[in-house]
Amino acid sequence: MPQSAQAREIVGFAGNYSSGTIVVKTNERALYYVLGNGKALRYPVGVGRASKQWTGTAMINGMQLRPAWSPPAEVKRDKPSLPNVIPGGSPSNPMGAAAMTLSGGEYAIHGTNQPSSIGGFVSYGCIRMFNADVLDLYSRVGWGTTVVVTR
């Protein structure tokens, strides 16, 4: 596990965000779930590689436990041997225990089948979490939750 991948914890958090907002700081490889009163729950995450990072605001528009995964076209181009669908719960499924899809594209906040990738710049733009952490976050959020991705 990269050194930057620390355990989830409650931390001080400054910023003009409403309680319940998710803030991803890619340079920190951290996801913050804003609790309010200057506090947030910080989770270590894996984020997009340098050429795959994005910033902006999205909303959670889908939530699934043990999701099946259909590799996006870009991933299939890079890894043509991948099947068209990997069933949920399969050890080869990179979505892990849960996924929260984001509006505006093919990105999601999801678990992983590669826990050693947490804390790195590793994905095609998705936000990867330890499976225990994604399940914890999943239990705290719902459809329409605001997600802000910054550097």
PLM segments and residue spans:
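Exported/periplasmic cell-wall-interacting domains
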Residues: 9, 13, 17, 37, ...
